[in-house]
Each structure stands twice: as structure tokens, then as C-alpha cells.
A protein has these predicted regions:
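N-terminal glycine-rich, Lys/His-bearing helix-loop that initiates the first secondary-structure elements
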Residues: 1-94
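PLP-dependent aspartate aminotransferase-fold enzymes
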Residues: 83-148
């Protein structure tokens, strides 16, 4: 299969590599011609568990028959159990669950600012990677000098 230009229906937010991926297993992916690649991007760092993991697929399939996602307005017992485990292991008091990296970065910025203000720091400063991608909200885009 020859990879054509990106569909006009897809916003051109990335310069796409001329490869059409079809499937994955662990840290490897295959294109529509059957060529194998090492997935060093992991879905831009959001797919760190790999592709088609034999222990994850059944667990995810089972969860899909129950709840995919629900608002934090409700108690979610498994989420609360995970929070207890994470806080115990990290020595922290609570966790903030997010759906995206943008939410995590935005939340971290807000928490860091609040911490600084609570400590009496007039203008708390936050350390971020320069020219890195932290999300597409105004707060995360203005956290670095990345013009995109």
C-alpha cells in the first residue's frame, strides 16, 4: 500500500511519516505492507504499556463490559483502591487522576502554584523542559518556549 497524503478531513497538526500502521504487539508495530518497526514513540508517550499485551487485553475487555469512564462526581471503587495503593507506596496523601497528559501537566502547574502561594512565595516558579510538548492548552503551551 502506498501512503497518500493525509486525509483532508484530518487537521494537519503533525508532519506525518509516510507509514500506515496497522497492528502492534508489545513494543513492535507493523505497517499495512507487513513491515515491522520498533515503536519508540509509544503513541507520543501515552501508550507505555505496549500493544496487545496478553494480560492487559482480557482485563480491558472485561472492564469494557462494565464502565469505560465515568465522572469523578461518583465513587469508583477500583479507582479508590488504586489511589490507596499509590499513596501508600509513594508516601503521599492523595493522587489526582487524569485522562490525558495535558490534564496531568495542567494539574501539576496548578498544584505547584498553589503550593508556592501556600508557602508564601510571591511568584512561585515552575521548572519545565524547554521546547518540549506539554499539551495544547494555553497554560501548557505558555509553560515553554515551544511556538507550536
Amino acid at each position: 500500500m502506498t501512503v497518500a497524503a493525509t486525509s483532508p478531513h484530518v487537521m494537519p497538526t503533525y508532519g506525518r511519516i509516510p507509514i500506515a500502521l496497522e497492528r502492534g504487539q508489545g513494543c513492535r508495530v507493523w505497517d499495512t505492507n507487513g513491515k515491522e518497526y520498533l515503536d519508540a514513540l509509544a503513541g507520543i508517550a501515552v501508550n507505555t504499556l505496549g500493544h496487545n499485551h496478553p494480560k492487559l487485553v482480557p482485563a480491558l475487555q472485561e472492564q469494557l463490559t462494565k464502565l469505560i469512564h465515568t465522572s469523578n462526581y461518583y465513587h469508583v471503587p477500583l479507582q479508590e483502591q488504586l489511589a490507596a495503593l499509590l499513596t501508600e507506596r509513594a508516601g503521599m496523601t492523595n493522587v489526582f487522576f487524569c485522562s490525558t497528559g495535558l490534564e496531568a501537566n495542567e494539574g501539576a502547574i496548578k498544584i505547584a502554584r498553589k503550593y508556592g502561594i501556600d508557602k508564601g512565595i510571591a511568584q512561585p516558579q515552575i521548572v519545565v523542559y524547554e521546547h518540549a510538548f506539554h499539551g495544547r492548552s494555553f497554560a501548557t503551551m505558555s509553560a515553554t518556549a515551544n511556538p507550536k
